[in-house]
């Protein structure tokens, strides 16, 4: 619904800005999102080519910064060809957690105002997940980050908690310490 790929059966889905302005979610609002799903979304090619899917003219410095934010730089820089290492479709040649971190780095590099992480840290251990979330808060202070998770530990980085139940979204906590 948030990406305008499906629409509610009744009512409407809107984005509400800090100033109260409402924008109805549609295919046109999709460009405001960087989306990282649970499964691998990497393509056959180099790591750099995968990152540049988000920002075609990304510099080495920008890619390095995004990889560091996603806790991927340490393993990418240790590969024989670094960001020029070839991977296969769906991140073949990498662990699932490594592929998730590269997908997160790609989303960071895109720089959209809303980052949607849909179980995007599910293959990470708790320590790495916590560091990725801390890094995102630091590196993207003006980006709205929407996190869907089944892991309670990730919730401590959220300023608002919502519960989806019976087709409704309900705010259950606001202004939690990050």
Which functions belong to the PLM regions below?
Residues 73-102, 167, 174-175:
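ABC-fold ATPase nucleotide-binding domain signature/coupling loops
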Residues 6, 102, 107-110:
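Hydrophobic/aromatic position at a conserved helix-loop-beta junction
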Residues 137-147, 155:
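Conserved catalytic loops of ABC-family nucleotide-binding domains
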Residues 109-113, 142:
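A short, proline-enriched helix->beta-strand linker immediately N-terminal to the Walker B motif
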Residues 12-14, 48-89, 133-134, 142:
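ABC ATPase nucleotide-binding domain helical subdomain, centered on the C-loop/LSGGQ "ABC signature"
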Residues 12-31:
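ABC ATPase NBD Q-loop/coupling interface
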Residues 115-118:
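Catalytic Walker B motif of ABC-type/P-loop ATPase nucleotide-binding domains
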Residues 3:
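Helix-to-loop junction immediately C-terminal to a conserved catalytic motif
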